[in-house]
Amino acid sequence: MDDFKYNINANYTGNVRLQKWYQTNCKYFSPKWKYTLPWWESFKYDKILLNIQKKILFDISNKTILGNIFNKYNINIPNINSCLINKYRDGQDHIIPHNNIYNSFGKYPTICGLSIGDTRYLRVKSIVNNYKKINGLSKLNKGICDVNFDYLLEDGSLLIMAGASQKYFSNEIIKNMSSKTRYSLTFREFII
């Protein structure tokens, strides 16, 4: 996992981190980005990644606490087939407010994010859907925020975002003073 791609749009989009995209069929995140955004090149799953994915799917599909929550609230169990690994080298690597509203994830995507390494805060805000396009990417304009929560993502924690969460909330990893590395393994269903 040493061949992470640097997001060369970092100065333009404000997203500073390294990333690697895995997809079971080795598809690009978006075919139109294939030649312009090389950090979205797809890599084939390895055994370790596949085992982590199977464990997450088992927990949300069966009579576990997580599975019971999915059942109680009629949350669709995703057919996870992709994983974006973000590498935050230190506390200065971050991602700006965003949400995952791409057609390639479906109308109401379920996102399962596993944190490994340093503890970081995830900020969640309610939003007014107001976007502008930057190099083909949807970037949130500043909108009215009614809700603002910071969640502590510790080593080994699993964050689930499901239902209409991507429509009504943005999320970001905020900067801090840490000098330690954090990995975020974000599993989801990629449908295109």
Protein language model regions, located:
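Non-heme Fe(II) oxygenase metal-center motifs and adjacent flexible, charged/small-residue loops
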Residues: 1-192
